[in-house]
């Protein structure tokens, strides 16, 4: 399978033989398992205070008084779950393991399947990405891209490739998050847009980090969640020639 390599002006800069990983069968089931496991394994432990609801002098009066055995303090029920300010019956435990296990072979197969999904224009469109009708997938650019340090240069490249509309979609879709996250440094929600896969992350990351919804990863470290956010394969991805060679070894 061959693909056209584009230069920084979007012009034809030759062809490249794609490795077999780009022809792997797309397995949404494996991709979903790998993504959900990655999300679960970075979940922060949480649980109730060991003494929550128990900091009271309430005592039960016992039997023989014609009244409930509920512990009371100053005539008010306390401590037990059915009282105001009492403990919870079965609170979350901080020692609980929320992680999920995935076999190594399945995890690697999920990455290969997610890589192959980036070659399917229908899957990319189904994820909601915007691009010109004449765009050919996968998108491969020359290694000159890795030398870019200015955001405007990246914007010019995306316009030449016919995929800048996806950046605009993500920018227009930015909304204020509902709930307590707005008070915890997560005020805005932003749609996911383009993923750049390169051999070196430093230069492209600096140039592209201010673009809405953009992520940068290396071919050696890109994972299933990078390629399939929300466990939906087919993310709009721009590869460099060197990154294609790196991902071939996955």
From Swiss-Prot:
Disordered, as annotated region: 1-20, 51-101
Record has rRNA-binding as a keyword: yes
GO CC terms in record: cytosolic large ribosomal subunit
GO MF terms, alphabetically ordered: RNA binding; rRNA binding; structural constituent of ribosome
Top-rank taxon, per record: Archaea
UniProt cross-references to Pfam families, sorted A to Z: Ribosomal_L4
InterPro entries noted in UniProt: Ribosomal_uL4, Ribosomal_uL4_dom_sf, Ribosomal_uL4_euk/arc_CS, Ribosomal_uL4_euk/arch, Ribosomall_uL4-arc
Subunit structure: Part of the 50S ribosomal subunit.
Similarity comment text for this entry: Belongs to the universal ribosomal protein uL4 family.
Matches recorded under HAMAP family: Ribosomal_uL4_A
Biological role: One of the primary rRNA binding proteins, this protein initially binds near the 5'-end of the 23S rRNA. It is important during the early stages of 50S assembly. It makes multiple contacts with different domains of the 23S rRNA in the assembled 50S subunit and ribosome.
Listed name of the protein: Large ribosomal subunit protein uL4
Taxonomic source organism: Halobacterium salinarum (strain ATCC 700922 / JCM 11081 / NRC-1) (Halobacterium halobium)
């Amino acid at each position: 399978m061959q693909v056209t390599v584009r230069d920084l002006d979007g012009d034809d800069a030759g062809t490249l033989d794609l490795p077999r990983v780009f022809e792997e069968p797309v397995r949404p089931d494996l991709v979903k398992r790998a993504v959900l496991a990655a999300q679960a394994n970075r979940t922060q432990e949480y649980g109730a205070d060991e003494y929550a609801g128990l900091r009271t002098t309430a005592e039960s009066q016992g039997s023989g008084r014609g009244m409930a055995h509920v512990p009371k303090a100053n005539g008010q029920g306390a401590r037990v779950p059915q009282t105001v300010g009492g403990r919870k019956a079965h609170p979350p435990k901080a020692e609980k393991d929320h992680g999920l296990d995935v076999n190594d072979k399945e995890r690697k197969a999920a990455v290969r399947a997610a890589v192959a999904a980036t070659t399917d224009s229908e899957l990319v469109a189904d994820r909601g990405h915007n691009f010109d009708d004449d765009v050919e997938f996968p998108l491969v650019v020359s290694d000159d891209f890795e030398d870019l340090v200015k955001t405007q240069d990246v914007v010019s490249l995306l316009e030449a490739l016919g995929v800048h509309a996806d950046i605009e979609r993500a920018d227009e879709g930015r909304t204020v998050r509902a709930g307590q996250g707005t008070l915890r440094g997560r005020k805005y929600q932003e749609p996911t847009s383009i993923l750049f896969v390169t051999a070196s992350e430093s230069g492209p990351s600096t140039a592209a980090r201010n673009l809405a919804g953009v992520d940068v990863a290396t071919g050696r470290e890109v994972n299933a969640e990078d390629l399939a956010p929300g466990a939906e394969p087919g993310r709009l991805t721009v590869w460099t020639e060197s990154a294609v060679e790196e991902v071939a070894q996955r």
